[in-house]
Amino acid sequence: MIGVQGADCAPLVRAFKKNLAPDKIERFPDAHTIAHSIEDDYPPDGDQALTAIRESGGLALGVEDEQMLLAQSMIAKKEALFVEPASSATVALRNCFWTMA
């Protein structure tokens, strides 16, 4: 499982990288992202999400707002769908991996 958050609002990503216990997730100061539906400086179910990511052997990664906007545009052009930025976050991450490969 891969958890994706906006890079400038990523408390789960930070907790994952710091190897914090799920009940020790820290608030993300000055959190801001264009992906408003996932813009939460302390996700209410963050402890469960972090546990699920770890138990699956997964990752928690952040994507920049610009990457989400590019993915949003790509989805609109290829699929004729206009999605909110949060919905394009996973596609943005996939695009990052695709570019690195």
Question: What name fits each language-model region?
Answer:
Residues 91-101:
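Catalytic phosphate/nucleotide-handling subdomain of diverse soluble enzymes
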Residues 83-93:
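Conserved phosphate/anionic-ligand binding catalytic regions in large, soluble enzymes, centered on
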Residues 2-83:
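Active-site/ligand-binding loops adjacent to catalytic centers
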